[in-house]
Amino acid sequence: RCIANSYPVPSVQTVASSYPQRHSAPSMERFEVVPLEHRALVAYLQERCIPAHIAKEKCKEAHYSVNGKPYFAVAFENVSGGWELRNRYFKGCRGRKDISYLPWARDGPSTECAVFEGFIDYLSALTLGIISGADAIILNSVVNVNKAVPYLKGYTAINCYLDNDTAGRTALTELTAIYGSTMIDSSTLYSEFNDLNVFLVTQSFTKNTLSNENK
């Protein structure tokens, strides 16, 4: 269940611009990617208020070993063939670190693009239904801002859903310096929260609270 349904307040911490340590690619052995089906991983994303059908459509499931011990995680591919890995206890990357680019349609690029810092925020936007028709770029780390620049050329509107912390604001400033008024700060939607997923979880909590009060 979404954590908004399970706890009196959303159990999400607001973290400043610090990034979790990641396993290096050489430490991962017997790496395999399969369709997302593991109940623990689907449940993890559902706790972040991401519906199972969206999670299974956009994500994969990775199995690997570290020092002989088996692990599994939600996997999200980047443009270099690397994989962002995430589960309830771990955040890491397999292969080259890079951005992810997801066109909305197969028959050509959209006129709009949405930019996210991490793939959980991208899944949150799909859940909220706020990027219909727009292509998407996931930075997978704000250090990848420059890698996103070539992909952003030609769009008439670029909606940025970056984190409301120092790193996120810096990334927005860098992109705005290049694309000017084409760049739209969409973080105003969740200005009281650190990121879009925290906003989604809180919105779900509020709706559930009001629903219970009206019963």
Map each language-model feature to its residues.
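Short, small/acidic-rich helices and loops at N termini and domain boundaries
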Residues: 1-5, 57-64
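TOPRIM fold recognition
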Residues: 111, 127-215
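Serine endopeptidase catalytic core focused on the charge-relay Asp
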Residues: 42-55
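Short glycine-/small-residue-rich flexible loop motifs, especially phosphate/cofactor-binding loops
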Residues: 42, 122, 176
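Non-catalytic accessory segments of DNA primases and related replication-initiation nucleases
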Residues: 1-44
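Phosphate-handling DNA/RNA-contact segment within nucleic-acid enzymes
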Residues: 64-151
